[in-house]
């Protein structure tokens, strides 16, 4: 049983192993608890526990059983009754151990052994169980950690997805922005087309004029011939006339004789001739009369007409200009002349002066009027307004001030508050110019007799001068003020009696009744303070307030208002903002001075009550007497009362008798005058007076607080009383910075605001948060307070600490009236808050559509009194007005403001869409410049955050952006040079809106095509605006909208001008057209437009090539390799084939590639098999044959085509040629006229015997420096860039543009250098550069591509060309130098490669120096030490650029066949510099300064070896000369642009008489550091020809030495030592030295 129990565990562990098969026994031994799962461990534990329990039971049973067996075995056979058995027991017990039986034979021993084993197993199991539990705990902890890691992984994955989404949105956003910009491109393209249309018209006109000119020339020629003929006739006639003249002279002589006779007879008959004079006199009179008539009708009449015209014009002009020019406020300092006198003077002057002279400048008027001294009477008349008699003159007189100049703004901070409507009331505010104040003082002191009648009487009839509108309105103001004050005071005072006078204050007359425009006060020389003036009157529609009739009022009102509108700089709803911003500090200074004077004046206890009727002449009534409850703002005096009639005003419900008090004004109070705390026109009760002011000067302790409370509560009476306290700070601010004016404006107490403003409270005083009273009033919607504050020059654009302007606060709270007032005042709609919100954000945030419409559509009125003349339009018809605006006018806000994003990137459209304000979103979307795809900082568009309704709206409003692509059809694969051509190019994205019509769509497509063709053919990276003016017809490639064969919208064909039933919007959405594809006409249609677009060869040139083929039948295209000869010939053949097939002729193209093994017999077989050559006896067929022979440069033209020259020139039987067939028979053949032959030669120029063939063919030379090849690469790469940017032209500073420009420059510089070296066989066409990669942001890819191109194509060609030229003139024994070049030739090749690499390739690379260093090693030959070139001067021409810097600029001695004028003009003045800059990277910079001493000897060594090694070949010498020249003065002028450190530069001059060639080399291994040998600038270099240098200087080539930074010498010299020590030749030594010059170009 125990055995079975012990075997439970192995059985359990064996169960899974048995299933595994063979390794069950091994698995049982390798049973590992760690591999079990938790459930399996639990099961194992339960099994173990059960086994242990069973084992315990078995043990107990076995123990009992053992005891029984022991007893039975030991004592069972014995019995106490049997002594023998007892003896036997004793014997057995006493026996020795050895004699006992083995224990193992006893079952109990076996059981004990089993139990001991079980105990050991139990202990082992418990140990394993404990280990398993610990591992289980560890596993649980690891699982928890794994779960945490998984959660973190999920979070990171989510963030990764979010970042990917953001990046995707950013990409989409950029793409959409590109599309939007393409829309702008379309608009500008339309302008371009218009300009082009005008240009075409001008061309047509020019051609017509040229034709007319030619016609005129012919006519002139004919007329000259006629003239010659007539002259000959005239000569004949002249001779005849001369003869006749002689006869007449003879006759005249006879007549003279007869006359003499007659005179004598007359004298005799004189006395009897009375009747004869009577006959002659009438004749004379008749003549004289005719003369007089002509004079009278012509001369005088003309003169009178002119005078009448001038007079009419001059007299009409003042009347015409009058509404704009009659001044309300004359210029500062103008003499206060009477209006009548002024008007008469001006009118009389207008009749005399020309109209031009009338436009005098403002300064002239001011200067001319300053010296005049005002007479008192004139001053008086001006103050009280023009009289009746002067009114007519005033209305007809021109203004002395230009209508566009504010009279006060040029010289004064602001007009005084009482000077709005007095024609001469504007006094200069400069301290020295105060005639206005002096006149006022004279008026106050000298007219006391009339003042009681005007100011103190109780009669209601106004004085006679009140016919003047100004004074009449002022009287109304006085009466209204008196009524309102009486109403205010009647609540707590005794009945009105009289006003208490102030001692010493002169009477004011009417000066104070003029409403103030600004708050700037005046300080008189005597210290007196001009009073703040009277508040304006209440509109006359209120009951009992209108006191005077106004019959002549309306006419003058129009004139005055219009003149005021035209004579002020800033208009705000008919309120003259008389003080420009620059005058605010001046105004504050004056006000502060006035406050100081107020605080220093003594305060006397006022009398409690004074009757106004008995007041002395010198008294003045306080502002309380003139305060008006609910009066209209100061800018609306009697001239505009009607405009205020419908405004709701705060007016007391009770009115007192208007006849009780006449308004007077407290003005010009002297410094010694006592100011009462409460002075009233009606008097005060004795019980109230002591409470307020009895017992001496009024205490000021709690006054500011009391002033705040009165203003906040709207207590007009108390506020007026406090304001008359002398020394009270009305601008006092409480703890939160609120002034009394701020409190009044915030609570909407218009009357209190007016009183405070009249008291000159600071209108722009801000609280601790930067809010002004205007901000508070606008935020609370108190539009009357806003209007009043604006009238007093409040800063409408003031921004609080958070950037909130009054307009922003008004929009934030939806106060339409305030918004309109502020907009009409000219506030800035684009001011932004601290978090980037504009008023448009605020209006949209509240969902207030009316506010948003006002912001977008409301314009400031053209005339300032528009609002007042049409009061009904003010507020109540706002919706209708704005709807009218939307329908008839465009939004006044720019697109930038509509699309402005706040600090979170949210535009107004985001806010409206996210809050579901669909109406606001619709208003925004009506703006044409809205960009609904603008994304916030979380990469969300307005559509992304919009509600469902707003999403639907945006989806319907957004324009569909469909890419427009140009396709040239499928390009046939093959070796036609078209491997890099693209079949399709995206040129732009078309914006299709709901309202887009098919006509608009056609125009957009046509315009986009025109713009694209113009863009890719322009010379630079011009924007479309620039191209409009910079493009010329020469730069065009000849493509236009007429080059289109077909257009497909998605998959549906469409033609320009075609219309479908659906609109373009619906059509594109219904058919799911993802793009518009334009297919250009190609060879299949007999056109070459697609070929032009694919290859960027101008259409005119391709058509010319085709014409040559059709006309001459034999055309050969030749040019450098890679000039697209094969592609051109194939496309021309295709076009010609389809043209012939269209004409009804069958046509076939036969291509043959010529190689070195191509024989003449093969060519004959080709011609015969293709039916080009036909037997003479056979008639030609109608079939057209086009034969293309490619790669003719691989064979000899004279050998291959020599026998065909005659027959090819004459395609007829007249020029037969006999060819022998393979069977030995010969037959005559001829080329029929339906045969065309085209050939291609990849060679820049013909040589040798091939020149004999030249005259028999028509040749098309594809030069690299002429069209079409010259601009082909630029156009091709430009189109590539445009395609990469999806139709947009990047800016010239874009890295992609710089990279493309660099690739283009590499091609040009390479060819320029190669042409200059006389190696035309190495010239490259643009084909190799067409594959230049255009990858925005990855210029390294282009550099890598360039290195591959250099290593695979350019370097091998250059090497082959240099070697071939260097060995051209060598002796036959040296003919193998090309295969086994000499050391000198190798040096020349390597030098040439290095120079080309650095001057033509690496020069101008857009990469930074550090990046370029990494790629330099990829170029073959880039690390060549250029000092070797210096030694092998005849061989190393090109690689020496950095090392040698030869100065010789004499013409290179070239072989004649290589010389070309264009090749001799290197464009390398800048490239050479760059080459040395690059090569210095390859130079070790370890040279020590001690090497400078041996510099001159090293130079001699270099030049000596230069000469010795140049003896091998003249061409090598030429090469070396060119290499030296390329490295010398051509680029030295730009060294300053390259050198990094100019502080350590050293110059070493070489003497011209140095015996360089005779120098011997004593130490070949001496390191020559030509870093120290620095070429001089071009003006310091020695320039001479070879002959000159040899004879005069003894030097054929003089080195130029550039300055070298000393810090870079050390490494190069050490490198030189290492290199030179490894060779026994001088060449290698100098090679390394030559390499040292490279850093000089840095």
From Swiss-Prot:
Recorded coiled-coil stretches: 119-276
Phosphoserine: residues bearing it: 1513
GO CC, alphabetical: actin cytoskeleton; cell cortex; dendritic spine; FAR/SIN/STRIPAK complex
Bias kind Low complexity: ranges: 395-407, 1613-1627
GO molecular function, one term: protein phosphatase 2A binding
Keywords carried by this UniProt record: ANK repeat, Cell projection, Coiled coil, Cytoplasm, Methylation, Phosphoprotein, Repeat, Synapse
Positions of modified residues (Asymmetric dimethylarginine): 491
Biased composition (Pro residues): 497-506
Ranges: ANK repeats: 702-732, 736-765, 769-798, 802-831, 835-864, 904-934
Protein name: Cortactin-binding protein 2
Organism of derivation: Muntiacus muntjak
Gene name in the database record: CTTNBP2
């Amino acid at each position: 049983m125990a055995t079975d129990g012990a075997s439970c565990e192995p059985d359990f562990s064996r169960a899974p192993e048995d299933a595994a098969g063979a390794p069950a026994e091994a698995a049982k031994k390798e049973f590992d608890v760690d591999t079990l799962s938790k459930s399996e461990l639990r099961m194992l534990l339960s099994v173990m526990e059960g086994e242990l329990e069973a084992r315990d039971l078995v043990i107990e049973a076995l123990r009992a059983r053992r005891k029984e067996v022991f007893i039975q075995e030991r004592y069972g056979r014995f019995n106490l009754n049997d002594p023998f058995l007892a003896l036997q027991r004793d014997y057995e017990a006493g026996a020795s151990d050895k004699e006992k039986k083995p224990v193992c034979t006893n079952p109990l021993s076996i059981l004990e052994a089993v139990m001991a084993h079980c105990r050991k197993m139990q202990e082992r199991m418990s140990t394993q169980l404990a280990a398993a539990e610990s591992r289980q705990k560890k596993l649980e902890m690891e699982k928890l950690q794994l779960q945490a890691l998984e959660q973190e992984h999920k979070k990171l994955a989510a963030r990764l997805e979010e970042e990917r989404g953001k990046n995707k949105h950013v990409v989409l956003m950029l793409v959409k922005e590109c599309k939007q910009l393409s829309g702008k491109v379309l608009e500008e393209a339309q302008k371009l087309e218009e300009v082009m249309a005008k240009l075409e018209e001008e061309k047509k006109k020019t051609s017509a004029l040229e034709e007319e000119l030619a016609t005129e020339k012919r006519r002139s020629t004919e007329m000259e011939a006629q003239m010659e003929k007539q002259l000959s006739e005239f000569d004949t006639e002249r001779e005849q006339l001369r003869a006749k003249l002689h006869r007449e002279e003879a006759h005249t002589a006879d007549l003279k004789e007869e006359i003499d006779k007659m005179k004598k007879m007359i004298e005799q008959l004189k006395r009897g001739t009375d009747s004869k004079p009577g006959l002659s006199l009438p004749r004379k009179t008749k003549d004289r009369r005719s003369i007089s008539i002509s004079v009278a009708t012509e001369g005088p009449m003309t003169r009178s007409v002119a005078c009448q015209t001038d007079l009419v014009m001059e007299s009409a002009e003042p009347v015409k200009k009058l509404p704009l020019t009659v001044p309300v406020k004359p210029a500062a300092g103008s003499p206060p002349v009477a209006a009548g006198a002024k008007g008469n003077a001006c009118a009389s002057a207008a009749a005399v002066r020309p109209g031009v002279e009338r436009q005098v400048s403002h300064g002239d008027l001011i200067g001319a009027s300053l010296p005049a001294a005002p007479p008192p009477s004139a001053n008086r008349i001006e103050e009280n307004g023009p009289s009746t008699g002067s009114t007519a003159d005033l209305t007809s007189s021109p203004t002395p001030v230009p209508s566009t100049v504010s009279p006060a703004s040029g010289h004064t901070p602001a007009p005084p508050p009482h000077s709005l409507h007095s024609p001469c009331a504007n006094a200069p505010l400069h301290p020295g110019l105060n005639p206005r104040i002096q006149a006022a003082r004279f008026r106050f002191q000298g007219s006391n007799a009339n003042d009681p009648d005007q100011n103190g009487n109780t009669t209601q009839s106004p004085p006679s001068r009140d016919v003047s509108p100004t004074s009449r309105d002022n009287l109304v103001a006085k009466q209204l003020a008196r009524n309102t004050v009486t109403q205010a005071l009647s609540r707590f005072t005794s009945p009105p009696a009289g006003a208490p006078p102030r001692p010493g204050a002169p009477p004011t007359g009417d000066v104070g009744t003029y409403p103030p425009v600004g708050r700037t006060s005046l300080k008189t020389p005597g210290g007196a303070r001009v009073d703040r003036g009277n508040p304006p009157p209440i509109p006359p529609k209120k009951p009992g307030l209108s006191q005077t009739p106004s019959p002549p009022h309306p006419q003058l009102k129009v004139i005055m208002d219009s003149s005021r509108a035209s004579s002020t700089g800033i208009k705000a709803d008919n309120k003259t903002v008389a003080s420009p911003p620059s005058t605010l500090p001046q105004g504050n200074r004056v006000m502060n001075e006035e406050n100081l004077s107020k605080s220093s004046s003594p305060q006397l206890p006022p009398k409690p009550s004074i009757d106004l009727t008995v007041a002395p002449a010198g008294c003045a009534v306080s502002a309380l007497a003139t305060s008006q409850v609910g009066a209209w703002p100061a800018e609306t005096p009697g001239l505009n009362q009607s405009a205020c009639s419908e405004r709701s005003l705060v007016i007391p419900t009770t009115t007192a008798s208007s006849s009780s008090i006449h308004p007077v004004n407290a003005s010009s109070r002297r410094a010694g005058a006592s100011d009462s705390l409460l002075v009233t026109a009606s008097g005060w009760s004795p019980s109230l007076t002591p409470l307020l002011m009895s017992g001496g000067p009024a205490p000021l302790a709690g006054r500011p607080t009391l002033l705040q409370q009165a203003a906040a509560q709207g207590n007009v009476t108390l506020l007026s009383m406090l304001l008359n306290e002398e020394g009270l700070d009305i601008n006092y601010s409480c703890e939160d910075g609120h002034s009394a004016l701020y409190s009044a404006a915030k609570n909407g107490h218009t009357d209190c605001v007016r009183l405070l403003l009249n008291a000159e409270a600071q209108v722009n005083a801000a609280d601790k948060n930067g809010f002004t009273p205007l901000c508070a009033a606008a935020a609370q919607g108190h539009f009357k307070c806003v209007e009043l504050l604006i009238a007093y020059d409040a800063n409408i654009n003031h921004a609080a600490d958070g950037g909130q302007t009054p307009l922003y606060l008004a929009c934030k709270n939806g106060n339409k009236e305030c918004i309109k007032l502020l907009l009409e005042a000219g506030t800035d709609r684009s001011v932004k808050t601290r978090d980037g919100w504009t008023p448009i954000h605020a209006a949209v945030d509240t969902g207030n559509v009316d506010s948003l419409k006002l912001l977008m559509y409301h314009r400031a009125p053209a005339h300032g009194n528009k609002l007042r003349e049409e009061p009904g339009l003010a507020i109540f018809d706002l919706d209708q007005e704005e709807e009218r605006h939307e329908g008839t006018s465009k939004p006044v806000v720019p697109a930038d403001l509509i699309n402005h994003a706040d600090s979170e990137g949210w535009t107004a459209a985001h806010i409206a869409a996210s809050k579901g304000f669909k109406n606001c979103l619709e208003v925004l979307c009506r703006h044409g410049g809205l960009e609904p795809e603008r994304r916030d900082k979380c990469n969300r568009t307005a559509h992304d955050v919009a509600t469902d309704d707003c999403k639907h709206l945006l989806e319907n409003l957004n324009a569909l952006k469909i890419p427009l692509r140009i396709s040239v059809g499928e390009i046939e694969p093959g070796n036609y040079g078209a491997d890099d051509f693209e079949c399709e190019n995206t040129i732009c994205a078309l914006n299709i809106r709901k309202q887009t019509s098919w006509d608009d769509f056609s125009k957009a497509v046509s315009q986009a095509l025109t713009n694209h063709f113009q863009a890719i053919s322009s010379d630079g990276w011009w924007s479309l605006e620039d191209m409009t003016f910079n493009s010329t017809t020469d730069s065009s490639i000849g493509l236009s909208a007429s080059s289109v064969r077909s257009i497909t919208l998605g998959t549906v064909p469409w033609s320009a001008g075609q219309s479908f039933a659906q609109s373009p919007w619906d059509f594109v959405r219904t058919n799911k057209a993802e793009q518009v594809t334009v297919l250009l006409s190609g060879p299949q249609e007999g056109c070459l437009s697609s070929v032009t677009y694919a290859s960027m060869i101008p259409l005119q040139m391709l058509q010319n090539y085709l014409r040559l083929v059709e006309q001459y039948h034999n055309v050969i295209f030749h040019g450098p390799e890679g000039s697209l000869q094969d592609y051109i010939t194939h496309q021309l053949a295709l076009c010609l084939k389809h043209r012939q097939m269209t004409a009804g002729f069958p046509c076939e193209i036969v291509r043959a590639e010529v190689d070195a093994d191509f024989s003449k017999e093969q060519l004959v077989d080709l011609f015969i098999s293709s039916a080009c050559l036909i037997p003479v006896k056979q008639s030609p067929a109608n079939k057209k044959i086009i034969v293309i022979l490619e790669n003719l440069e691989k064979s000899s033209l004279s050998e291959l085509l020599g026998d065909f020259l005659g027959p090819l020139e004459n395609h007829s039987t007249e020029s037969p040629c006999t060819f022998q067939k393979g069977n030995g028979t010969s037959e005559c053949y001829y080329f029929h006229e339906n045969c065309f032959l085209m050939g291609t030669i990849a060679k820049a120029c013909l040589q040798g015997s091939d020149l004999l063939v030249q005259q028999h063919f028509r040749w098309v030379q594809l030069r690299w420096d002429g069209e079409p090849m010259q601009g082909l690469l630029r156009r091709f790469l430009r189109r590539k860039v445009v395609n990469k940017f999806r139709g947009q032209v990047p800016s010239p500073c874009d890295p992609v543009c710089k990279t493309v420009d660099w690739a283009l420059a590499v091609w040009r510089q390479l060819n320029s250098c190669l042409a200059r070296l006389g190696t035309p066989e190495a010239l490259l066409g643009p084909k190799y550069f067409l594959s230049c990669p255009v990858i925005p942001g990855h210029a390294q890819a282009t550099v890598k591509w360039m290195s591959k191109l250099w290593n695979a194509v350019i370097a091998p060609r250059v090497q082959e060309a240099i070697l071939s030229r260097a060995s051209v003139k060598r002796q036959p024994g040296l003919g193998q130098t090309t295969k086994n070049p000499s050391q000198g030739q190798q040096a020349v090749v390597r030098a040439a490669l290095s120079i080309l690499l650095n001057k033509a390739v690496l020069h101008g690379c857009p990469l930074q120096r550090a990046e370029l260093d990494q790629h330099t090693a990829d170029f073959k030959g880039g690390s060549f030490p250029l000092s070797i070139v210096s030694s092998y001067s005849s061989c190393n021409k090109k690689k020496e650029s950095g090392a040698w810097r030869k100065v010789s600029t004499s013409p290179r001695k070239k072989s004649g066949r290589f010389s070309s004028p264009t090749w001799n003009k290197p464009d390398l003045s800048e490239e050479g510099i760059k080459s040395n800059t690059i090569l210095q990277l390859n130079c070790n910079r370890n040279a020590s300064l001690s090497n400078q001493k041996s510099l001159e000897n090293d130079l001699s060594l270099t030049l000596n070896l230069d000469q010795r090694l140049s003896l091998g070949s003249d061409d090598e010498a030429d090469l070396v000369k060119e290499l030296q020249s390329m490295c010398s003065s051509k680029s030295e002028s730009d060294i300053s642009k390259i050198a990094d450190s100019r502080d350590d530069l050293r110059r070493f001059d070489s003497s011209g008489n140095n015996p360089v060639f005779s120098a011997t080399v004593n130490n070949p291994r001496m390191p020559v550091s030509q870093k120290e040998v620095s070429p001089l600038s071009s003006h310091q270099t020695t320039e001479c020809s070879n002959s000159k240098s040899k004879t005069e200087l003894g030097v054929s080539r003089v080195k130029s030495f550039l300055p070298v930074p000393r810090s870079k010498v050390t490494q190069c010299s050490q490198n030189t030592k290492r290199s030179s020590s490894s060779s026994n030749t001088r060449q290698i030594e100098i090679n390394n030295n030559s390499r040292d010059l490279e850093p000089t170009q840095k």
